[in-house]
Amino acid sequence: MTKQYIVIGAGILGASAALHLALNKAQVTVIDRNDAGKATNVAAGIISPWLSQRRNKAWYFLAKKGAAYYPQLIEKLAELGEFDTGYAQVGALHIHSEEKRIEQILALADKRKAEAPEIGETRKLSVEEITKMFPYITEPMRAAYASGGARVDGRKVTQSMKNAAIKLDAKYIEGDAALQVEDGKVIGVMVDGIVIEADEIIVTTGAWGNETLQPLKLDMQVKPQKAQILELQLESEKTEHLPVVMAPSTLYMLAFEEGRLMVGTTHEDDKGFDMRPTIGAAHEMAEKAFQIAPDLREAQLSELKVGFRPVVPNAIPVIGRLPQFSNVLVANGLGSSGLTVGPYLGKELAALAQGLATEIDVDNYQLTNVIRHEK
């Protein structure tokens, strides 16, 4: 009898897991309740982990693999007729006011190139070169450039993966899935009063992960981190080829087609699922942007987006089977790396669910670090 798989949560991670299961001819049902504030839907992602100052090797392995996997994923999606992914390799600018910091970033890039040739060309840019590449930056700054940097629209690439999975006979249900336990074993889920049975259940519900596991009397240490992002409309609509920009103080800017410019972001802990966009966050992000790109004061404010990143205590994603319920797999805690890591980790999660070899060492991302029995 053919194994049945259920994926609960169709953000970028769950959509990827479903797609890769479907690519391997598995029978998959994807269930998502489409919560307001899901991280994937508001995320505009910069794919350029190689110049990050984060030193954790387990995190960097995932981020490096995630960035390298994107071209293969985009090719697979195109083969399945999905072209509107919001992904483009446009290069990345790492901006700083201090020359010394730029030299440190480039030295790190040179060290990492051997294992990550997808970094592409790296070099230091003059003030004039920066303005030529990204005309809105008019203040004198220094920059390290990596030609392999890319940007992606979280909503679009996730929708493309869902569409592709459905074309491969995956089923999609919008609804609230509750895990069902019989005789100490998870037999499936209940959605709208109907029980759907499965052999393997994958839980990828992000910031809502703890809620999903409540029927199992387990407590997952994952919390929502509120992110707010400005979406601006520029007069020039020829913006799709502008490089992504990363600057100090968690400022980033990335442009899409037709003059859309995203400016982010905030990292707000202990706000719960507060969906309100706040003037304080808008002011904070705008002021940071104006310091390097003062002409953005004349841009039109289109929207202030709000979403919730799933964060775990040590900020390293977790993946694995629940020790107490071996047919339930969980992956979570991608934080602000979700768009870089999500598609690749979803592929690995699908392999794990099917008993196939994984590239990652799951011991480096132990689920047991964040799971506790409820008292």
Positions of PLM-derived features:
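Helix-loop-beta segment of a Rossmann-like dinucleotide-binding subdomain
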Residues: E82-H94, K111, E118-L168, T266-D270, ...
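C-terminal catalytic lobe of FAD-dependent flavoproteins
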Residues: D295-K375
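Short beta-strand to alpha-helix junction loop
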Residues: F61-K65, I95-Q104, A144-N163, R276-A281, ...
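Dinucleotide-binding Rossmann-like beta1-alpha1 core, especially the glycine-rich loop
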Residues: I46-E129, K288-F290
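Beta1/beta-strand and adjacent pyrophosphate-binding region of the FAD-binding site
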Residues: M1-G11
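Active-site substrate-recognition segment that forms the wall
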Residues: S16-N24, I31-R33, I46, E82-Y87, ...
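Short hydrophobic core segments
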Residues: I6-I8, I196-W208, G346
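A conserved short coil-to-beta-strand element within the FAD-binding core of flavoproteins
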Residues: A150, K171-I187
